């Protein structure tokens, strides 16, 4: 939903999913004790000889105007290339998949042989690592991502917290509202410069997380 002169919550769907997961554990595992802890989160550089691909997606309304984005950085954290796609009207979940597919496509086109993929959408990681996709609406996107991944000799997929994905998070809104269908950024755009500099400096961000303790 979009309100005039007000920014819609781009993370509403993710927040709802996280709260639903917390409810599930509390409702179906009554012997699970949940403790809130504060973690210090930052963007981590890839291993030597690897590049890191961070991707993200957002939908202004879910479904609504959507964008899929990503950033590729080298082992020193330097910006190699970024991108933003205006997808049109779709869900945040599909926008995340578009961002991942575009990012993997760029990695293949650039002949990167070792790629660490990070994104903050655990549900996307679940469908990418699952042998079967039962949702016909996303089958082609998922298949494309899997096929592209096979063309990269060394590749890993990892979930990260939003605080470790700030640069792409900032890009996400740009993708949803930009006029061009697809834009390549050879350097950080102005709206991303500040958070990208924080990543390069290794700045930590605090995040309150739930830690589950299972009792017998």
Regions found by a protein language model. Give the residues of each.
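Primary recognition of RNase H-like, Mg2+-dependent phosphodiesterase/nuclease domains
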Residues: 1-216
